[in-house]
């Protein structure tokens, strides 16, 4: 696990859900996606992460909406007009690497909740269970991004790797599609087409009592989605020696999606987070904190102040 040592040794990472649904701090959202993406302050954003002590970033490229923050030849072929002109992911990767930080890209593996137009374009609705056409088209998208970004991206965090019968929130709950939809070797081949060393995790949803892999033979670290601080590496059996990783939201529930306004304050005290981080680090676990971000690319001030305090404290330990 030499290639993942940066995750094991770093104090923590930061995840943000910056998508077409993200709301501003005040006023109404900017309706033009290209204008939003063009306005994202990459250098200032990277400086903020460096200042608070984060060692990696997980950033969304498409999530709960049909807008993507980087151009993609396959998307343009099947679903034109939904990619930004600016390659925000490539610019983030470059800015982070210049500061010694790493970039992991969030990417969804199903589009059940997306617009009908998007589902038709990629063949999602052709059959309630058989997702072969969708998988072929979606792997073209993944491969195109992987080859486009190359070594600017250090990892993938793939979401929605689950059985539809287990998730009542799905539009097609009970339809019967599940992880058998993946041609596993081809999927991971597409993910690593541009960078054979890229790290990969597959997320099956919020864990109940332990984090696990979906395809242990192919994954490098645990996706680790959690809604609280209860799951820790000390009481979690590692699966096939994969890097333990916990991902917890700190303020708004995964994203500032509901309405314009100030993002909620941190829900944990400094001592609670230090206790969690301390135990995870003692067992060589990695931790990512999801924090709120506004439409203009600025981060929740109270949460960032808390992370900055944590970063200073961890340096003294």
Question: Predicted regions: what is each one?
Answer:
Residues 1-317:
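Mature catalytic domains of secreted/periplasmic carbohydrate-active enzymes
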């Amino acid at each position: 696990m030499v290639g993942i040592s940066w995750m094991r040794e770093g104090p923590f990472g930061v995840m943000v859900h910056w998508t077409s649904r993200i709301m501003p701090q005040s006023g109404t959202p900017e309706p033009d996606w290209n204008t939003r993406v063009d306005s994202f302050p990459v250098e200032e954003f990277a400086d903020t992460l460096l200042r608070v002590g984060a060692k990696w970033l997980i950033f969304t490229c498409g999530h709960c909406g049909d807008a993507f923050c980087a151009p993609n030849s396959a998307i343009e072929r099947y679903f034109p007009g939904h990619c930004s002109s600016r390659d925000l992911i490539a610019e983030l990767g470059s800015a982070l690497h210049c500061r010694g930080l790493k970039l992991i890209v969030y990417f969804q593996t199903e589009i059940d909740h997306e617009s009908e137009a998007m589902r038709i374009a990629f063949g999602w609705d052709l059959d309630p269970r058989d997702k072969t056409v969708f998988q072929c088209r979606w792997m073209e998208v993944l491969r195109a991004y992987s080859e486009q970004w190359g070594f600017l991206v250090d990892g993938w965090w793939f979401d929605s790797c689950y059985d539809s019968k287990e998730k009542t929130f799905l539009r097609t709950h009970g339809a019967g599609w599940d992880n058998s939809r993946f041609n596993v070797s081809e999927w991971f081949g597409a993910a690593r087409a541009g960078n054979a060393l890229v790290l990969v995790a597959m997320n099956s949803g919020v864990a109940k009592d332990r984090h696990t892999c979906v395809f242990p033979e192919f994954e490098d670290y645990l996706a680790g989605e959690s809604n609280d601080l209860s799951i820790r590496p000390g009481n979690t059996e590692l699966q096939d020696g994969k890097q333990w990783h916990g991902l917890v939201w700190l303020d708004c529930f995964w994203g500032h999606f509901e309405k314009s306004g100030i993002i909620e304050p941190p829900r944990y005290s400094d001592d609670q987070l230090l206790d969690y981080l301390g135990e995870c680090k003692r067992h060589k676990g990695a931790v990512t904190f999801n924090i709120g971000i506004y439409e203009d690319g600025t981060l929740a001030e109270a949460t960032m102040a808390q992370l900055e305090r944590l970063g200073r404290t961890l340096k003294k330990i």
